[in-house]
Every structure is written in C-alpha cells, then in structure tokens.
From Swiss-Prot:
GO cellular component: cytoplasm; nucleus; Swr1 complex
Main location group: cytoplasm
Protein name: Acidic leucine-rich nuclear phosphoprotein 32 family member E
Region (ZID domain), start-end ranges: 194-247
Compartments where found: Cytoplasm; Nucleus
Composition bias type Basic and acidic residues, residue spans: 228-238
Ranges where the LRRCT domain occurs: 123-161
Family per record: Belongs to the ANP32 family.
Gene Ontology MF, one: histone binding
Keyword tags: Chaperone, Chromatin regulator, Cytoplasm, Leucine-rich repeat, Nucleus, Phosphoprotein, Repeat
Gene from which this protein is expressed: anp32e
Amino acid sequence: MEMKKRISLELRNRTPAEVAELVVDNCRSSDGEIEGLTDDFKELEFLSMVNVGLTSLAKLPSLPKLRKLELSDNNISGTLETLAEKCANLTYLNLSGNKIKELSTLEALQNLKNLKSLDLFNCEITTLEDYRESIFELLPQVTYLDGFDAEDNEAPDSEADDDDDDEDGDEGAGQLGEYEEEEEEDEEGSEGGEVGLSYLMKEDIQDEEDDDDYVEEEEEEGGEEEADVRGEKRKREAEDEGEDDDEDDD
C-alpha cells in the first residue's frame, strides 16, 4: 500500500490536526520520499515509518510537537538536517538499520537540543572504533545510545510512559478495590448460596423420607386390606361349608 493512501486510512474520519500518533510501518514510499504527511499534523507527537523504503527526509513537514520518531529499516544515508529544522522538540530518534556510515552524517543532530535517546543498531557506523565514545562526544545532549548511557546503564521508561504508568496504576488500584469488593460480595453470596443449597438439600431429603413413609403406610394399609379380604373370603367359605353340611344332614 502506498504511504499516502495508508496515511489517509489511518486518519479514520479524523482531521490531521486531531492525530497525536501515526504509524505507517511497512507501506511503500514514492521514490524514497515521504508523501501524504503535511504541516496539518501539527499535534503529532509520535510518528513511526518503519520499513517504508525511505532514502531521504527532505519532504518531512514541520512537526513542532513531535517527540518520538521511528525510522528503522529504511535506506536513509543523509538529509538529517531536516530533523533539526522540522522537529525541534524531538527527544527520541530511531535510525537503526539505515545506511549511516560516518560520524559527519550525525553532525546535523547537534541542533536537536532536546534529543535524549538515539538508536543506531545495524548501521555501519556502529562498527567504527570507539563508536559509542565518539557519539556521546559529538552529541552531548544524548543520554542513551542504543538503549544504554555512557556508563552502560540501561535506559528507563520515558517520563511520559512513567506518567502513563502512574495514571494506569491509580486506575488499576481503583479497579482492584472494586474487584475486591465484588469478590467479597460474591463470597458472601456464595456462602448464602451454600446455606440455601444445604437447606434445600435437607428439605429434599426430608421430602424423600416422607414419601418413603407414605409408601410404607400405603403398603401397610394395602396389606391390612388384603388380610381383611382374605379373612372375609375364608369366613364366607366356612359359612358355605356349614350350609352344605346342613343340607347333607337333611
């Protein structure tokens, strides 16, 4: 998909001025140039154009609020001065996997006074002797190079991410409290349910016992009735025999 069309789709019924984050990774640039991105994206803070075939940043529009820029896995070898001109507030820049070979190419980044983190993984420049020391000397404003500072301490999350985490933590705590309350209610409900179930089971057992007693009573009554019937039958047979004897005597 062409970059211009991809950007249009990513708007999702928003105006460019409403977009703070834009990701157009793996689309196709036109002749290695940026297209479809305009000055109207004035609120853009995060832009990712990974593996889009860029060779130049010359057509990058003015993005005064842009703080994070992902440009890894492209074919950029220069024109980095555009970044200082168009994205003065940039704090994080990822140029990993590009065609950057010389320290002189990075001199243009000296004017990015707010740049704190720079990634150059898989760029030829990383094979130079004293590469890290040279970058920190060339760009003193940079604190983290390829994820580590000059003392080999790993970069922490950004302040923005920390703020987001704090907010998420507060929300999470509230949600956890609600969850615990619901869980307690569920436990109480479960206990009540167990009592009710136990009670019902006892009732069912009692009903079954009553039914058994009723059946036994019916059987006993049936047995008594059968005994009465048999008694009556024997009585009638005895009377009949008596009558027969009287007739014989006559």
